[in-house]
Amino acid sequence: MDATYVGAYGRLKVYEVDFLKKDFLEHLISLDKPSDFSSVLYASVYKEDYDALTSIYREPDLTEMAINRHLVRMNRIAAFAIPPLAKNALTAYISKWDIENIKTVISSKFLGHGLKETEMFIVSFRDIPMGLIGGVLTNEDYRNMMNLPNVEAIINYLTRYGYGSYMLQFIEDYRKTGDISPMLYSLDRYYYARLLESLKYYNGDEGPVINYIRSDIDRINLNTILKGKKLNISYERFFSGLVDGGNIPINAIHDFYGNSDILSMIDSIKRYYDLEDAKNKYASDGNLYHFDVSMRNIMITKYMGTMSMLPLSLDSIFYFIIRAEIERQNLRTIYEAKLHGAPKESIYDLMINGVV
């Protein structure tokens, strides 16, 4: 344990009571209408977020943005609580939202979507962009990028940061093929390489965080090959999109892809991850999301409990910010289901469990 984490741990413990409990989420699932969801969420710790945005947005956008804003607020709490020696690790982790936002902006520009259509998916556009906490992209940067004429202009804009320079190596392929996926994949590789480099052993007790990140890389890679197999794409087409640094070696990923179908691929992965339940659900309805949800739940169950039990360490801070992410994802899942009239029973298959 490190005494420099004492203040951080104390501050975060105060705010942990703000996390929504399992029975609250189940109550949200039981509601019939999106407006009921919004009313109940407004009456919780999310009231501040609604009030800050109510003059700018109307439903259903207001609830989406309030959920995003709350995540930013929780991450700010963690960012300002962290000891100086741990700042690089947290900054590298939080930059994931820069990555997601950049992907959103590039994809929207590629599809011809405008500013209004894009800002709903930026975390967070009108209030405080997540990258600002990490000292990278600002609110103005996102506005500027969304107003640029095309994808290449966005890449050139990003060259002032590390992201754009890394993506430039794929610009010629984009010009030839019109395919933006290699550039988007490159952002994942850039992010995880930088993150793993930042997570050097400081006290020797950051193992759970590192293992969680390695498992997340496995999740990304498994999602990639499962989509590839579903679409019958050759391995060479997406090999450049695989991320190094996971628990599963890249050559093993290649071997998995050699299986004839998705079900046999999942069987061969079993020595790393038991996805049998997700496999059965996929066999029933053909939806790949079961595997992603199962991977996330495995990671949460395996590592989050340990992180929470190492109070004076980097683990306790990562526990806080990962828990905030899970809450956001679960709330968005429930709300989207309400907006689209999905059966209540189906929502449970999409929920990330294990921490509430």
Swiss-Prot record:
Family annotation (InterPro entries): ATPase_csu/dsu_sf (IPR036079), ATPase_V0-cplx_csu (IPR014272), ATPase_V0-cplx_csu/dsu (IPR002843), V-ATPase_V0D/AC39_subunit (IPR050873), V-type_ATPase_csu/dsu (IPR035067), V-type_ATPase_csu/dsu_dom_3 (IPR044911)
Record family assignment: Belongs to the V-ATPase V0D/AC39 subunit family.
Its job: Component of the A-type ATP synthase that produces ATP from ADP in the presence of a proton gradient across the membrane.
Gene3D superfamilies: ATP synthase (C/AC39) subunit, domain 3 (1.10.132.50), V-type ATP synthase subunit C domain (1.20.1690.10)
Keywords for this protein: ATP synthesis, Cell membrane, Hydrogen ion transport, Ion transport, Membrane, Transport
One GO molecular-function entry: proton-transporting ATPase activity, rotational mechanism
PANTHER family: V-TYPE ATP SYNTHASE SUBUNIT C
Keyword presence, Metal-binding: no
One CC-aspect GO term: plasma membrane
Organism: Thermoplasma volcanium (strain ATCC 51530 / DSM 4299 / JCM 9571 / NBRC 15438 / GSS1)
Alphabetized Pfam families for the sequence: vATP-synt_AC39 (PF01992)
One GO-annotated biological process of the protein: proton motive force-driven plasma membrane ATP synthesis
Name assigned to this protein: A-type ATP synthase subunit C
Subunit description: Has multiple subunits with at least A(3), B(3), C, D, E, F, H, I and proteolipid K(x).
Membrane topology per record: Peripheral membrane protein
Compartment list: Cell membrane
Location (main, coarse): membrane
Gene encoding the protein: atpC
